[in-house]
Amino acid sequence: CKKAVACGAKFIVSPGYSEEVVSWCVENNVAITPGCVTPTEIMAAMSHGLKVVKFFPANVYGGLSAMKALSGPFGGIKFIPTGGVNDKNLAEYISAPFIHAVGGSWLCAKADIAAHNFDKITSLCKEARKTALGFEIAHIGVNAGDAEESLAVCRALDAAFGFGVKEGNSSNFAGSGVEVMKVGRPDKNGHIAVKTNSIPRAAAE
């Protein structure tokens, strides 16, 4: 890691935990993310003030279920799983609250790098980002004049389509897809609610 830093590296990520490497990085103010898959390794990382660790290989050491179990006693720790993460399970990983980030070799295959196929790599990265954010329409918002009208609209939709009615404080829902506000709002034309796997990541876009 000393050679990497001498060559300009601003952070170090290691597949496993090395006390020597972690101590040197902390002492020299170099960001370090060590691989930790056991309580002992996580506690060692925490003793140096670290809050993010790598979990590798994730598919071998239990994946999400293992990290979820570890996040119980180590609630302040976030994981970066690599190994077994791909475009098929990316959304499941990234939406877990104890996941800081993920890594996957499918984004930058050695063959694509060697062939300078950067357009393909860029496309894969964009698709991964889209999957990670997981934008979907959550519901459509409709404005009603008052609480009585709001409930009447929801009941009409339920009668027509069997959506079901859920009454709330400031609005009522017809199923999960239509929200009818009880009073007028500044957004006079209603609203469209979009959900995401991660609000902080979405806000950074």
Regions found by a protein language model. Give the residues of each.
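Catalytic cores of alpha/beta
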Residues: 1-7, 40-49, 65, 71, ...
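Catalytic beta/alpha-barrel core
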Residues: 1-2, 8-18, 31-42, 51-59, ...
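Glycine-rich phosphate-binding active-site loops on the catalytic face of alpha/beta enzymes
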Residues: 16-21, 54-64, 98-121
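C-terminal helical cap(s) of enzyme catalytic domains, especially alpha/beta-barrels
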Residues: 25-30, 111-133
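N-terminal beta-strand motif that seeds the catalytic metal site of vicinal oxygen chelate
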Residues: 129-154, 187-194
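Core segments of cupin and vicinal oxygen chelate
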Residues: 141-183, 201-202
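Mid-chain, well-packed structural core segment of small domains
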Residues: 185-205
